[in-house]
Structures are given as structure tokens and as C-alpha cells.
């Protein structure tokens, strides 16, 4: 890969799927000083389509018992308050399963899934994954369904997606396991808290959809590696040059911005 120029930035976070530990952080490009702005942990950016498993299909599977074979219609559609929503390719594909809809990242089915679940259920599902939505008059705006909000970074998203990989158990990322105070000799130990935030079935189905997205070449970047990968990509509607990519491979998950 060739960078466009030296000013283009990136942030990467990698966590351990098994224990939630933060394995690696790519804070940015061309770092010259200590304590510079960290693009992996400090930014708040649109997650784009990487939000769809979290805000749309995850809650629908968890609370409405949708299966991967649930049929949904990709056709001309509007937000509740009016205004047409478009797909990334400005086309409609008609009736499809949610597996196809999420795998091929269709926007209109994603909004329908978001609308099918109650606001309180979406809030519970999302916040349990460490993501903080934005509110307008007490409501989560429907733009969240396609990642249209400023509110995540690579570390938060990696931790959220790792929950799907480990069967619905969320672990807040941590970067050390113990610390000793020099003046007292007291040792502080980090004990990761594991919380079950969704059913194992929900996590399994999202994981399968993201894995099949690679197998079926919806996500071409991961399909050439010859390894078992689950992945979701996203772009911002505000800036087409802003790209996110999440990948689950074996025992690790990485999110890049």
C-alpha cells in the first residue's frame, strides 16, 4: 500500500479475543514526539458501515430473534422524518437475507433493522459494547444505523467486535496486568471483568455473517490471505477518503482508521 502523502493519518488498535488485553496500538503516522495525539484511542470519528452489526443487526437478532435467513427488502426507502436513504452504489437489490444485506453493506436494510428494534433495546445493546451513542431530544438518531455520528475510535470498536468473537462476552481493554508503587511496594493488579452482554447465538450469527462476507468476496481485502477471517469495512459519508476496516483473525481483532 502506498500512502497518498505524509499528512495522511491512521490509527490502529489490536486486542486479544481471549482475554481482552490490548496487544498493539498504532497511534499515528510519522510520530516525532512523545505524547502526541493518539489516533487509535483519542479520536471520535464516524464508524461508517462498521456500525451496522452493533446498532442494527446485532440488536435485531438479540431482541427480535431474527436469523441470518431473515428476509428484508432493499428498495426505495426514507428515514422516519423524511428524506431518502441511498445505498453506496445508488441501486436497489430487492428481497434479500440479512446475511446478504450486512455482508454486502446495504444501507436501506440496515435502517429497517434499526427501526424494527426499540430505542431502549438499541441503547442497551450498544452501551454494553462500550459505545456511546449521540442523542437528539432523548432519541438515538436514525443516522446511527449507517454510522453517521461522531463517537468511536479504533480501540472502542475493536473491543466491541471482539465481543462477537468471544461469544457475547465483553471485556474492557487493558494495557497492563499489574503495577508496583515504588514508594510503598504495594502491587496493583488488574482483574479483567467479563460481562455477558448478548446471547451466544447472536454473537455466533454476526460472526458467521462477517466471515462469509470475506468468503463471498464482499470484503476483498481479506479474501486473499488464505486464512479464516471475519471482516467489516466502512467509509464516511462526510469524507470519502476516511476509511475504516475491522478484522477478526483467530485470537486477535484489529480495527484501523
Question: Language-model segments: which ranges?
Answer:
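Solvent-exposed loop/turn segments at secondary-structure junctions
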Residues: 18-19, 29-33, 46, 77-79, ...
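Conserved catalytic neighborhood of penicillin-recognizing serine enzymes
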Residues: 65-122, 141, 170, 182-212, ...
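Active-site SXXK
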Residues: 20, 46-72, 101, 160-164, ...
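Gly/Ser-rich catalytic serine loop of serine hydrolases
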Residues: 42-52, 148-151
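Sec/Tat-exported extracytoplasmic proteins
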Residues: 1, 16, 26, 58-64, ...
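A penicillin-recognizing enzyme superfamily signal
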Residues: 1-4, 8-16, 24-27, 32-43, ...
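Mid-domain, small-residue-enriched loop/turn segments at the edges of structured enzyme/sensor domains
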Residues: 83-86, 118-159
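Structural recognition of the beta-strand scaffold that forms the well-ordered cores
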Residues: 11-15, 22-26, 71, 100, ...
Amino acid at each position: 500500500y502506498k500512502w497518498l502523502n505524509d499528512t495522511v493519518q491512521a490509527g490502529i488498535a489490536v486486542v486479544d479475543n481471549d482475554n481482552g488485553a490490548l496487544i498493539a496500538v498504532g497511534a499515528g503516522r510519522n510520530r516525532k514526539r512523545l505524547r502526541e495525539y493518539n489516533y487509535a484511542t483519542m479520536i471520535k470519528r464516524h464508524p461508517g458501515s462498521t456500525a451496522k452489526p452493533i446498532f442494527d443487526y446485532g440488536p435485531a437478532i438479540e431482541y427480535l430473534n431474527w436469523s441470518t435467513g431473515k428476509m428484508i427488502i432493499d428498495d426505495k426507502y426514507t428515514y422516519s422524518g423524511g428524506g431518502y436513504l441511498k445505498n453506496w452504489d445508488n441501486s436497489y437489490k430487492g428481497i434479500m437475507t440479512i446475511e446478504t444485506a450486512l455482508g454486502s453493506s446495504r444501507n436501506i436494510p440496515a435502517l429497517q433493522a434499526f427501526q424494527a428494534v426499540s430505542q431502549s433495546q438499541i441503547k442497551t445493546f450498544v452501551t454494553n459494547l462500550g459505545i456511546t451513542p449521540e442523542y437528539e431530544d432523548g432519541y438515538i438518531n436514525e443516522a446511527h444505523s449507517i454510522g453517521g455520528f461522531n463517537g468511536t475510535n479504533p480501540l472502542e470498536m475493536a473491543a466491541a467486535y471482539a465481543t462477537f468473537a468471544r461469544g457475547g462476552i465483553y471485556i474492557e481493554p487493558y494495557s497492563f496486568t499489574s503495577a508496583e508503587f515504588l514508594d510503598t511496594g504495594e502491587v496493583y493488579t488488574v482483574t479483567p471483568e467479563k460481562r455477558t452482554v448478548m446471547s451466544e447465538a447472536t454473537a455466533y450469527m454476526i460472526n458467521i455473517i462477517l466471515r462469509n462476507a470475506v468468503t463471498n468476496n464482499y470484503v476483498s481485502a481479506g479474501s486473499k490471505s488464505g486464512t479464516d477471517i471475519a471482516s467489516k469495512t466502512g467509509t464516511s459519508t462526510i469524507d470519502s477518503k476516511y476509511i475504516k476496516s475491522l478484522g477478526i483473525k483467530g485470537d486477535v481483532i484489529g480495527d484501523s482508521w
